[in-house]
């Protein structure tokens, strides 16, 4: 086996940060849509937004354009850890199974994607909790990233920073286990078929396809994960929140219907599409650098 290659880690992190900055307002509207309408939390019971565009306009009008980037600092911190580990681990694990990219199979890529998703998301979970908490705030964020981080730690302890970690790992296993293999297989077949070469157009089409596949597979888990992470330690006895991820799933389905699990799907897909396009196009261009 060849020595561990550092390039996928660095390139993956840089490409992930670039993609995050380019699509963050869409991600914020997704979070706001997913946390609204919760009958067991008075703060988020009201249906404030009718959809993604309405959320973008209303947030910008009522809270200012700066609010569309609420939580960008922990999001970039998350991608610098999660994105770096995810891409680097995925590429490294593949080389453990096969030496040449041409010998990769769908099964190998899925296994490597699932493992890299679980590992990277578990390590980066505190930054994910922080990002969602800051995105959910509908007023000026107080204390900044460090202040919010300390607030979560002081009120909820270490467990608060890893709240929803099992669901985050499950979601990452689904997303990474779908997106990265779909990208690789789509790109491989487009090139081998002779329809397209190894060009930016191939990278564009492959990344768009994997974004759609990832959104369809992950949205229900994403809704539950977002609600679990946004749930605070409540003092009101009538507002007990969710006892666990399964309880959150069942309550959401029972109180709001099955399609509540696909709340935020359009901003989720419209984010994952451009996000993956920016990610993979940037990553492929970085790979061409002679370093």
Swiss-Prot record:
Solcar repeat windows: 7-96, 104-189, 198-289
Subcellular location: Mitochondrion inner membrane
Top-level taxonomic group: Eukaryota
InterPro entries listed in its UniProt record: Mit_carrier, Mito_Metabolite_Transporter, Mitochondrial_sb/sol_carrier, Mt_carrier_dom_sf
Catalytic activity: sulfite(in) + sulfate(out) = sulfite(out) + sulfate(in); thiosulfate(in) + sulfate(out) = thiosulfate(out) + sulfate(in); sulfate(out) + phosphate(in) = sulfate(in) + phosphate(out); oxalate(in) + sulfate(out) = oxalate(out) + sulfate(in)
Membrane topology: Multi-pass membrane protein
GO molecular function, one term: solute:inorganic anion antiporter activity
Alphabetical list of Pfam families matching this protein: Mito_carr (PF00153)
Family stated for the protein in its record: Belongs to the mitochondrial carrier (TC 2.A.29) family.
Described purpose of this protein according to its UniProt entry: Antiporter that transports inorganic anions (sulfate, sulfite, thiosulfate and phosphate) and, to a lesser extent, a variety of dicarboxylates (e.g. malonate, malate and citramalate) and, even more so, aspartate. The sulfate/sulfate exchange is much higher than the phosphate/phosphate and malate/malate exchanges. The transport affinities is higher for sulfate and thiosulfate than for any other substrate. May catalyze the export of sulfite and thiosulfate (the hydrogen sulfide degradation products) from the mitochondria, thereby modulating the level of the hydrogen sulfide.
Official protein name in the record: Kidney mitochondrial carrier protein 1
Species annotation: Macaca fascicularis
């Amino acid at each position: 086996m060849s020595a561990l290659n550092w390039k996928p880690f660095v390139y993956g992190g840089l490409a992930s940060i670039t993609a995050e900055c380019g699509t963050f307002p869409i991600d914020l509207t997704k979070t706001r849509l997913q946390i609204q309408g919760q009958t067991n939390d008075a703060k988020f019971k009201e249906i404030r937004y009718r959809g993604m565009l309405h959320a973008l306009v209303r947030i910008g009008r009522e809270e200012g354009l700066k609010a569309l980037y609420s939580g960008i600092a922990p999001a970039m911190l998350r991608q610098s850890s999660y994105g770096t580990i995810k891409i680097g681990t995925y590429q490294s694990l593949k080389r453990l199974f096969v030496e040449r990219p041409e010998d990769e199979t769908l099964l190998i890529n899925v296994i490597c994607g699932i493992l890299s998703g679980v590992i990277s998301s578990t390590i980066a979970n505190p930054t994910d909790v922080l990002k969602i908490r800051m995105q959910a705030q509908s007023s000026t964020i107080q204390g900044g990233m460090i202040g919010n981080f300390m607030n979560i730690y002081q009120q909820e302890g270490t467990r608060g920073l890893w709240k929803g970690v099992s669901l985050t790992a499950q979601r990452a296993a689904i997303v990474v286990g779908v997106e990265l293999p779909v990208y690789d297989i789509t790109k491989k077949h487009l090139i081998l078929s002779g329809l397209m070469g190894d060009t930016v157009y191939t990278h564009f089409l492959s990344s768009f396809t994997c974004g759609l596949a990832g959104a369809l597979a992950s949205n229900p888990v994403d809704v539950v994960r977002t609600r679990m992470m946004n749930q605070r330690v409540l003092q009101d006895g009538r507002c007990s929140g969710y006892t666990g991820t399964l309880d959150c799933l069942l309550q959401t389905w029972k109180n709001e219907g099955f399609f509540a699990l696909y709340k935020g799907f359009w901003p989720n897909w419209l984010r994952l599409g451009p996000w993956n396009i920016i990610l993979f196009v940037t990553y492929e261009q970085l790979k061409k650098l002679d370093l």
